[in-house]
């Protein structure tokens, strides 16, 4: 049963519904829809209830949220986990215009990239997977999901698709949030040099 008192406060007293597709926050979400690379941003975008749940399960929190009234009605308990100041109610049409999901289920969020920690070189018994220039986002996401199920502790990425890109996140089913990773960018020689340096650091801690 919906807590009508909670919902009334949520809608009437706390938030201002966004109905314009030209709203600045909506435009910011839309920039990720156009394919902006997460490596050039301070934030990345996640879409859908499942990824939101996985983000929270991993101990991380969103910075900005777009959500429909319908979603709030259906997910009252989950919505209570968010700081009210982060929530921005939008119409279903506005949400659909802002994100890449064809049939969005009612929620999307921006997350600070700094909230996703890099791997720390302090454990000699870690199980580390090294991926060399995996370009296909679907394959990258599947590898993250499989690695998590297999007990991998961290992933080193020598270029390739960015793990915080939309297609990788969807394919990983949120596994990216649970696996620390290091990504090495640049020309081939720079990537190899950075990777070898990191492997050397592992050796120094007894790996």
Task: List each model region and its residues.
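Boundary-proximal intrinsically disordered activation/regulatory segments immediately upstream
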Residues: 6-73, 160-161
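Short active-site oxyanion
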Residues: 40-43, 61-64, 85-86, 153-155, ...
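RNA substrate-binding interface of SAM-dependent RNA methyltransferases
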Residues: 57, 88, 116, 121-207
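Short, aromatic/basic amphipathic alpha-helical patches
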Residues: 73-84
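Short, hinge-like loop/turn segments at secondary-structure boundaries
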Residues: 81-83, 107, 171-176
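Glycine/small-residue-rich loop that forms an oxyanion/phosphate-binding "nest" at active or ligand-binding sites
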Residues: 87-108
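Short, structured interface segments
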Residues: 106-116
């Amino acid at each position: 049963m919906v807590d009508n008192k909670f919902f009334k406060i949520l809608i009437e007293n706390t938030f201002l519904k966004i109905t314009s597709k030209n709203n600045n926050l909506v435009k910011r979400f839309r920039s990720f829809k156009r394919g902006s690379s997460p490596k050039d941003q301070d934030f990345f975008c996640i879409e859908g209830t499942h990824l939101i749940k996985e983000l929270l399960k991993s101990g991380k929190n969103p910075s900005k949220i777009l959500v429909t009234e319908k979603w709030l009605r259906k997910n009252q308990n989950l919505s209570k986990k968010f700081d009210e100041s982060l929530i921005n109610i939008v119409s279903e049409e506005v949400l659909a215009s802002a994100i890449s999901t064809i049939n969005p289920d009612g929620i999307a969020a921006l997350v600070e990239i700094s909230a996703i920690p890099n791997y720390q070189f302090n454990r000699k018994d870690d199980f580390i997977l090294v991926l060399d220039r995996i370009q296909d986002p679907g394959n990258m996401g599947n590898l993250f999901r499989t690695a998590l199920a297999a007990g991998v502790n961290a992933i080193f990425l020598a270029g390739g698709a960015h793990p915080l890109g939309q297609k990788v996140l969807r394919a990983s089913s949120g596994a990216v949030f649970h696996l620390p990773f290091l990504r090495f960018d640049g020309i081939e020689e720079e990537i190899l040099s950075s990777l070898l340096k990191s492997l050397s650091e592992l050796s120094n801690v007894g790996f």
